[in-house]
Amino acid sequence: MAVPGSFPLLVEGSWGPDPPKNLNTKLQMYFQSPKRSGGGECEVRQDPRSPSRFLVFFYPEDVRQKVLERKNHELVWQGKGTFKLTVQLPATPDEIDHVFEEELLTKESKTKEDVKEPDVSEELDTKLPLDGGLDKMEDIPEECENISSLVAFENLKANVTDIMLILLVENISGLSNDDFQVEIIRDFDVAVVTFQKHIDTIRFVDDCTKHHSIKQLQLSPRLLEVTNTIRVENLPPGADDYSLKLFFENPYNGGGRVANVEYFPEESSALIEFFDRKVLDTIMATKLDFNKMPLSVFPYYASLGTALYGKEKPLIKLPAPFEESLDLPLWKFLQKKNHLIEEINDEMRRCHCELTWSQLSGKVTIRPAATLVNEGRPRIKTWQADTSTTLSSIRSKYKVNPIKVDPTMWDTIKNDVKDDRILIEFDTLKEMVILAGKSEDVQSIEVQVRELIESTTQKIKREEQSLKEKMIISPGRYFLLCHSSLLDHLLTECPEIEICYDRVTQHLCLKGPSADVYKAKCEIQEKVYTMAQKNIQVSPEIFQFLQQVNWKEFSKCLFIAQKILALYELEGTTVLLTSCSSEALLEAEKQMLSALNYKRIEVENKEVLHGKKWKGLTHNLLKKQNSSPNTVIINELTSETTAEVIITGCVKEVNETYKLLFNFVEQNMKIERLVEVKPSLVIDYLKTEKKLFWPKIKKVNVQVSFNPENKQKGILLTGSKTEVLKAVDIVKQVWDSVCVKSVHTDKPGAKQFFQDKARFYQSEIKRLFGCYIELQENEVMKEGGSPAGQKCFSRTVLAPGVVLIVQQGDLARLPVDVVVNASNEDLKHYGGLAAALSKAAGPELQADCDQIVKREGRLLPGNATISKAGKLPYHHVIHAVGPRWSGYEAPRCVYLLRRAVQLSLCLAEKYKYRSIAIPAISSGVFGFPLGRCVETIVSAIKENFQFKKDGHCLKEIYLVDVSEKTVEAFAEAVKTVFKATLPDTAAPPGLPPAAAGPGKTSWEKGSLVSPGGLQMLLVKEGVQNAKTDVVVNSVPLDLVLSRGPLSKSLLEKAGPELQEELDTVGQGVAVSMGTVLKTSSWNLDCRYVLHVVAPEWRNGSTSSLKIMEDIIRECMEITESLSLKSIAFPAIGTGNLGFPKNIFAELIISEVFKFSSKNQLKTLQEVHFLLHPSDHENIQAFSDEFARRANGNLVSDKIPKAKDTQGFYGTVSSPDSGVYEMKIGSIIFQVASGDITKEEADVIVNSTSNSFNLKAGVSKAILECAGQNVERECSQQAQQRKNDYIITGGGFLRCKNIIHVIGGNDVKSSVSSVLQECEKKNYSSICLPAIGTGNAKQHPDKVAEAIIDAIEDFVQKGSAQSVKKVKVVIFLPQVLDVFYANMKKREGTQLSSQQSVMSKLASFLGFSKQSPQKKNHLVLEKKTESATFRVCGENVTCVEYAISWLQDLIEKEQCPYTSEDECIKDFDEKEYQELNELQKKLNINISLDHKRPLIKVLGISRDVMQARDEIEAMIKRVRLAKEQESRADCISEFIEWQYNDNNTSHCFNKMTNLKLEDARREKKKTVDVKINHRHYTVNLNTYTATDTKGHSLSVQRLTKSKVDIPAHWSDMKQQNFCVVELLPSDPEYNTVASKFNQTCSHFRIEKIERIQNPDLWNSYQAKKKTMDAKNGQTMNEKQLFHGTDAGSVPHVNRNGFNRSYAGKNAVAYGKGTYFAVNANYSANDTYSRPDANGRKHVYYVRVLTGIYTHGNHSLIVPPSKNPQNPTDLYDTVTDNVHHPSLFVAFYDYQAYPEYLITFRK
């Protein structure tokens, strides 16, 4: 029957009718594999009726279903091939039952069949792998089945290896090692041999027993019993005996009846014993899973006590960790003793375990160590028990013992029972002390604790019965009590009393029986109260000594040792003496004053204090004198210039020490004495010429140095003090014997002349006269100048007495006290400026810097430090570390640079230096942009000096660099930063700035001094910080200080008391505009505050100005009456009250000037104008006013000044939106957009019609707002008017009168009338519309010009006395723009001068091209070069001879040059600048005479010759320019070029006109010109001008009316010029020839040519027309001769006789062009020079001789006819007025070259 609960499948395969042997096993393995077949647990049975078929029984049905669902099944059998399997459900259940029946039958007979030996192939098939267990061997006889195939070798030694056993078995059995397995079990000292092939194991054992090797190895072989027990391992949790029994009895698992189950849960294993041994074969071959956990099954042999694992290693499971608990105190104890824990850990490791100590509780976790695996299974089983036993043994060495103790008792004794050997802990809840530690320690300490408890208990009882008292006694008084016998006496009388002293609380504690305590307290108090004290003054040196010694020890030495019961203590700066009695106090004072002393030793050379000898001496002295206690101290003061040693202490020791140290210093100190010898020339003379003196000095060990480095010029003597002083006297005697004289010369070039051959001249003077000579340089920089060779760019006054100088020069050679070096953080001077300074300074500078870094660390950017200067000529060098530039951190870089500069200035101030030089820090390798760098440095300097009111030691700050680019950047930065100030002009080196002229106000930056001596200072700071005697404050009428920003800032600093006092002062006073109240200053830095009620501006009303003037004057009067020195005014009224800032600045300064001039001031010296640094407008206004007055622009007492034309038109400003304002003379002129009817003024002007009743535009608005009364008044006055205007009342408008003018009339005339009318009525303000721009339709530009012109005329005539302000109110914004443009056009200009008719005429005639005023501005700089020579010699005679020789030499070298030329008059700014440059670069002096005109040059010959060439080139250039200008004038007379712009034609200027005409005549296609300052190209073909942007203008050429060309001229064929040769038959030829031949008949005429030059002809005729008109009936024209050379002919033909020919061949009668009456004069070879072919040329010329007079050689223009009228000149000059033979013409176009005669001899 079928297996219950199984699900069968029928399997057929491709193996045929005779299936292979063991196929059953292969199929079972295949279908058991889920991976190969999809199956699982199953059983395979062969169908007995059909051996080729098999039935597979699956237990879970779903497993069978999976096998069915898999389509292909293949069984791969190695060596036999692959078999295809077919699976299907069985046909009927009977078929299955039949299989089981057949199996039972075959089972019984199976062992009887096939007894014969199987063949080899069959034997191989029966072998199964060891790890799957062993199948029973086939074909084994039944009687052998109970004989074991396993042999055990017991008593296995450790030295027997598995190889040895295998070899033994092979030798004894004769089998190969493939036929058996050897398994060594070291835990039991046994090895088991399992035979794979059937042998006679009994015989094998017997053979082994006899084998000699077995005997030698002492092995005990025996036949291992056949077992029916298995060991099952890897059991899952939850298994038990019953479930295991059921599992292994299940046939599905291959099991059978179980005899016994022994389960080992801790090992997850069990022993299963079966009744039937054969079951083992099935189970061992079956793969078992228990609760889805795969099981490991091994045969178990009881005789061995273990299972056989075969090739598998036994699964050894280590025991689980377990915990042990320690007593908590013991655990705490061990936690504090790490070494004990380590000892326990080490001991437990021997038990193969590891301990983990809990950090929170007394738990110890014990885990098996990895080494336990090697100890074997028996040891593993007993591991936990063994470990617990060992730990218990260790724990027994320690003890925890509690002791019952009261908490109060414990607090008392706990500090006495501390012992590090054990843990002592108090349990508050249990009131027990717990002792934990090693047993012996705990027992020992327990005894001590119990004894301490007992003794303490008794002590507490005694204390409860005793008394404790505290007394406050100072340490000093306690010191005296201790040294008196009182305390010892008390302790003797009262032995039970305790006396102790707490120095911290200064309490003296008495403890003991109450009677004893009270007695002791009374006696101590009595003693303390009788003590006496006294403060005495001692010197600072002695006080310092007492500070350094211990007062107790020194009091014992000073007082107690002398039996004086006293002590000293330091109290503040005095010494407090305390004694037990007044008598002892007197003795103590006497003792202190007599026993202590100090002495000083001045040390000139500090180096002596740094030597080892000095250090050793002072050390030994201090050691000797201060053995105990200290009796002397030695202080070395080396920070000052001269060092000092102070010895302080006990008199005897001080005297001894002083004597020794003084002698040492005198004997070892070297000193220097510099004998300053001036001039330095004397030093050279003494050094060379007085050689006999120096060896005498050197014999006494005094070193002599001439002109030592880094010191003043002189002779330095170095040596011992006595010898040096003697040597100084010798040097002075020698010096006095020398004669020195200086000679000064102002000959130009003298200095350079000497310098060129200085060595030669010096050697000659020495050879000839025995003297020394030198050129005296500026040794000391004069005020305003700079050192020699260093260029000063600017000077700016920073503060009174402090100047900022920008100068180009070498930072290592400057006349300053200290310089700033741009350094890096490490003060390593590797490159750039730092390297240059370091090289000049020598190694001392770098060494000192290294010490600074070592001492103070690296310097961070933004810091500065100071070091020695080494060999540099400075006291110190300041090293400033600037930042490295980063664009991302620019603000930080600027901050750091600013900080570095300011710290450098602070260091200079700290060391009391007067001058400092600063370079462009960080601008080099640190990459700081130069512009940003210099601006930051200048700003930092400005802040340091201008915003700090404290006094400054620094008086000169130099900004220096060798690079001109850097210095220029510095100068520009100074100009920018100080733009509101007027810097001094940079004076040339060595020259002081010009002093202010008499009557002018002296001016420094922010400073003015009035003629009366009152100083005015411009101070930029808040009013609350003012430090003057008096401060002025602006307050409202209610006197509330918190309402205004000015008074509020004062109130905040002064405190509320200021308001309270002001209220008190104001009571009973009628406060109104102009009231001045005086109060105290309270917390302010001044002495008094003057509170003023300032007026509102009210458009500049007279009353407001008057009140403000009265306020200012009264404040100064109060200051003077209080006998105070200074007063400070803020810009009162310029804020909410509306005073314009520039008007207030002018008003207050004017009032101060007036007050100073009218009063004899006794005490008032300074008036400060306080301006907040952020109030830039007020600062600018005051700075402008300061600068204006400093320039001599002093105004009168009144604010306006009519006649001052300096800067007649002021600058245009915009005080409010839509308002523009400027000064016109003394009048404030405003234009504003708005409604005129809302304005407030003395007069409002109405622009109306002829009938004065216009009801349109502005007139309508004015009449309607003014009211009906004004209209009626207009009607009445219109009928009776005598002028073009009428005056009515103001009506409802805010004015006194309305002046009605006619808008269509002349606007300038109308405004002038209004101004005059207002002046008559003393009105100060006028408001008018843009007259005529409405219905009269006048152009706004013309109206604006007319109004401004009217005001200008009014002011210029001096009429403006009352009128202060004129305001134009405009309705239309475009009209406002026109007015603004007109104001800007006149901004900053002066009055225009009017040109007279005569001057215009003179200009036309060529007398003058420029006004003389302009030339007066061109002044040739006066060069005052001088040289001073210093001569040194033996006596006066030698020196004077040498001076005379030098003067003669210089005089001979001087070379003069003179040039007299008319063109010198035409020199303009360019020529003057060139002349000035010549003076600068050459050793010459140039003087200029404008009248002659004449240039004189004086200097050394080579420079004079160079100047001559350049001056003559200048004259030639000017002459050519004038010729061009003359041509331009000529051309412009009849040709005019114009361009058209916006349909308006504009003329080109005359030079451009000439340029265009020349280009046209030269037939150029294009020419470049300028139109309105833009470049245009004119196309002469299309007549268009095009600019660079393509914008085009049309151009045209106009021909003016001109003189007709002579009719006899030949056709010029559109040429501008031609020469026509005349035929001898022409009448013209004959006429000219006959005239020539009258005096030149001996010459042969080759040809006569007519010159046809229309331009020259027109110019000549125009000049003739003018002369004819001027001279009336005079015959103005003559035909004369003029001889010339061939080279001049082309020029004359084209240009005529212009000024370039003036004086060319003669100057006897003037420097003009000469024309002769007779031809023979001109034909002379002097004038008509023959060419190479012998041809000569003479012109027959038309000359305008006009009215003439006698000439002379000095004339460059004709003389005047009348001395009273210098512009009315003669036309020409002649040699003889009555019989002239020649004429001299001076002007262009005064002659026309009509005919050219070519002839030869």
UniProtKB/Swiss-Prot annotation:
Catalytic activity: L-glutamyl-[protein] + NAD(+) = 5-O-(ADP-D-ribosyl)-L-glutamyl-[protein] + nicotinamide
Residues modified to Phosphoserine: 33, 1403, 1411
Subcellular location: Nucleus; Cytoplasm
Expression triggers: Up-regulated by IFNG in macrophages. Down-regulated by IL4 in macrophages.
Keyword Nucleotidyltransferase included in the entry's annotation: yes
PTMs per UniProt: Auto-ADP-ribosylated.
Free-text function comment from the UniProt entry: ADP-ribosyltransferase that mediates mono-ADP-ribosylation of glutamate residues on target proteins. In contrast to PARP1 and PARP2, it is not able to mediate poly-ADP-ribosylation. Has been shown to catalyze the mono-ADP-ribosylation of STAT1 at 'Glu-657' and 'Glu-705', thus decreasing STAT1 phosphorylation which negatively regulates pro-inflammatory cytokine production in macrophages in response to IFNG stimulation.
Protein name per the record: Protein mono-ADP-ribosyltransferase PARP14
Organism: Homo sapiens
